[in-house]
Amino acid sequence: MSSSSAHQKASPPIEEEATEHGPFPIEQLQASGIAALDVKKLKDAGLCTVESVAYSPRKDLLQIKGISEAKVDKIIEAASKLVPLGFTSASQLHAQRLEIIQLTTGSRELDQILDGGIETGSITEMYGEFRSGKTQLCHTLCVTCQLPLDQGGGEGKALYIDAEGTFRPQRILQIADRFGLNGADVLENVAYARAYNTDHQSRLLLEAASMMVETRFALMVVDSATALYRTDFSGRGELSARQMHLAKFLRSLQKLADEFGVAVVITNQVVAQVDGAAMFAGPQIKPIGGNIMAHASTTRLFLRKGRGEERICKVISSPCLAEAEARFQISSEGVTDVKD
């Protein structure tokens, strides 16, 4: 692509500051009588919004160094006045859900079974074997989330945690070109971090929260959410510790989705389940993480290979989507419809 054509590409419509309808910055607690020093202690502990304080268990707040039990009660009271945590009517909830944005996947057929695309404000899990299209779909979403709302985008940046070293900026440039976006701007709007162990992966979420306070993000990707758990925890002896660590990580992801309204997309590896039935039907594959992963995901998608570059996505579980399948294709332009 020549430099002259690059200048003709549209820049993604990203808002540099959080919208007025976004979460309350943690500094808002000062207006409710919380001392600036205590607010700083909350922020240093990774609590960057009033919502994050309101959603935290009291025992977690008590663990913050330098904040007494009396101060914790005062902080909780102040946060609860700013963030409504009580009952609301189903009609109000319905009105709120009508405003939820879906991010296009790049394939109309896939968008159709997802009721418009990947839902913001919730966790979507994609699992499947190697080369089933999980990472390619994540790359495509990093571009489409930056599109205008009327084009199926979220007008926000993307945040990508890479646990397997499979993120490729060149793919982002190719996909941006397909959508007529300036490649350099699109890359600038993707915040990337490589995760090296499960503790590091969790710490990156604290950094992500502070970034989301500063500017609008529409998408957060963790590829893969379980890869490091398979290496950091081994054997049945560490299974309980692994599941507890994974549950806390997934809960932190859900809090980010709740606080900032981002679409959280996590990929998951699979393992072959070999039992007596497998002798006749072949080994069945199941996603890693067990019930903890299954319950944490709002929408669960199973991706598998088709013929050539064709892939098949099946909705496994969702509170609002019917069980259905869609075909899509992986090309140099990312995820597209199958060309028959």
Swiss-Prot record:
Pfam families named in the record: HHH_5 (PF14520), Rad51 (PF08423)
Residue runs in coiled coils: none
Sample GO molecular function, one term: single-stranded DNA binding
Annotated spans, Disordered: 1-22
Any one GO CC term of the record: condensed nuclear chromosome
Subcellular location, record wording: Nucleus
Record: residues binding ATP: 128-135
Family, per entry: Belongs to the RecA family. RAD51 subfamily.
Its biological purpose: Binds to single and double-stranded DNA and exhibits DNA-dependent ATPase activity. Unwinds duplex DNA. Component of the meiotic recombination pathway. Seems to play a role in mediating chromosome homology search, chromosome pairing and synapsis at early stages and probably chromosome crossing-over at later stages in meiosis. Probably is involved in the repair of meiotic double strand breaks (DBSs) and in homologous recombination.
Protein name (Swiss-Prot/TrEMBL): DNA repair protein RAD51 homolog B
Species of origin: Zea mays
Gene (name only): RAD51B
